[in-house]
Amino acid sequence: MVGFWQARAAAGTPAGAARWRPTDHGVKLERFAVRPEFRNQEIGGALLKQVLTDVRAKFPDAPVYLNAQLRAVPFYERQGFERVGEQFEEAGIQHFKMVLRRT
């Protein structure tokens, strides 16, 4: 099972996308992206909110985590994620593993 979400601008232009998948460690959020011309318009936050609603409906008690690029860490921290462990490299890009805090 994999979930895929796409955000579109008012004119129907693709603005962003994301997916999630269950793993042995919980539910991993992956491939979050917002096109540069649509950034800083709250699209990423709205997309993340919809993805989390979908994940919680299917896996209400599962831990939710992701690997965030360094530049995205502040965004995910504002959304309730916290860093876990040390910084690491994936595909030549520095990341932190982040886990959604339980509320």
Put a short name on every predicted segment.
Residues P22-E30, R39, K58-P60, G92-Q94:
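A conserved beta-turn-beta hairpin within the catalytic core of GNAT-like acetyltransferases
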Residues E77-E86:
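Conserved acetyl-CoA-binding loop of GNAT-fold acetyltransferases
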Residues N67-R71, E86-T103:
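C-terminal "cap" of GNAT-fold acetyltransferases
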Residues V34, N40-D54:
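Conserved acetyl-CoA-binding loop-helix of GNAT-fold acetyltransferases
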Residues K28, A33, Y65-N67, K97:
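Conserved beta-strand segments that form the floor/walls of ligand-binding pockets within enzyme
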